[in-house]
Amino acid sequence: MESEGWPALQPLLCFAWIAATLPIIAAALPIPTAVGGHLLRRLLSAFSSRGKTVRPSPASSSGSSSSKAKFTVPQKYFMHFYVVGVLATTILLLAIWFYAYMKLTPLLLESSSYSTIFSHLVGSNSFSFGRVRSRTMGHKYRVWRTVFALLLMEVQVLRRLYETEHVFHYSPARMHIVGYLTGLFYYVAAPLSLASSCIPEAAEYFQGQVPEFVVKGRARMPDLVIDSSSLLQPLLKLGWTQWIGAVIFIWGSLHQIRCHAILGSLREHKDYDEYVIPCGDCFNRVSCPHYLAELVIYFGMLVASGAEDIPVWFLFIFVITNLSFAAVETYNWYLQKFEDYPRSRYAIIPFVC
């Protein structure tokens, strides 16, 4: 079911993710310098740089440093990503949850044995009836799966917003404006991708409610009564795939919390632009275990969503490529900055890169 104006949402999201991912993949490929490979890698490194990897070199002239500053923003603007993410995710979560509650409740399982007996008694037409009921049930599950996935996304952005304010102590370093805009795009497109299959029908539902409210008026509209148990019961009746995804998500989140606590403890003085080698937890194996945990988190979301919508796959592919590229850049920076940096560490994924 698709509302007018929304049928192109999924293709647009796929195109946006592909457009954001391809330059990263191209920069990672061994493209010869003669055809612009080195330039592409330098440009992408500059655009994606932040914090320690974007600071002007001490040998740079004052004019060069001033020019770089024009295209950068303070690294503490990371908070903007999560504010936007919370707003976008909350709006989508509340809208689709309300739509699912009003139109797709209760969520009940059909008895296969009852359907079989009924088909023998009534005849072959019952098979068509069963298929219709099956499609209806599948549609209900798809919408409630979306609510579940958006709940996980909401937990993620709320936690990251909290960590940005209370865990991380950002230095005076800066990040490139292109990376900043990419972050804003990401935290709008990610919840849209998770909800893309349900947005058209939810939008159609709300579009139908507005004229009804205008015609009838508030006094003649039925009172809205929300049963809290009906809000949660459909989520508890979802399949085992959703709960496996939730367990993966929770494991990745707990691991990332530990990694962020380690990183936050390295900079007790906010005004000092100084970096040290992080140690402990998986930092002893990889340079960016917090990025690895993020991959696990979004893999959990992918599993919990049912992994049926193409935009969610492109979202996950972007997360893999973007964080892998950033991890390699960070790893190379550590090697250049610290002579005693452990070269046995991988960038992000043990035994892979």
From Swiss-Prot:
SS bond partners:
none
Q: Which GO terms describe its cellular component?
A: endoplasmic reticulum; plasma membrane
Tell me, in a sentence or two, what this protein's role is.
Answer: Plays a key role in early steps of protein N-linked glycosylation by being involved in the conversion of polyprenol into dolichol. Acts as a polyprenal reductase that mediates the reduction of polyprenal into dolichal in a NADP-dependent mechanism. Dolichols are required for the synthesis of dolichol-linked monosaccharides and the oligosaccharide precursor used for N-glycosylation.
Q: Where in the cell is it found?
A: Cell membrane
Q: Which reaction does it catalyse?
A: a di-trans,poly-cis-dolichal + NADP(+) = a di-trans,poly-cis-polyprenal + NADPH + H(+)
Q: Does the keyword Cell membrane apply?
A: yes
UniProt family annotation: Belongs to the steroid 5-alpha reductase family. Polyprenal reductase subfamily.
User: Lipid metabolism: is it a keyword of this entry?
Assistant: no
Name the Gene Ontology biological process terms.
Answer: dolichol biosynthetic process; dolichol-linked oligosaccharide biosynthetic process
Stated EC number for the protein is 1.3.1.94
Q: What membrane topology term does the record carry?
A: Multi-pass membrane protein
Keywords from the UniProt entry: Cell membrane, Membrane, NADP, Oxidoreductase, Transmembrane, Transmembrane helix
| Record-given protein name | Polyprenal reductase 2
PROSITE patterns in alphabetical order: S5A_REDUCTASE
Where does this protein act, in terms of pathway? Protein modification; protein glycosylation
Superkingdom classification of source:
Eukaryota
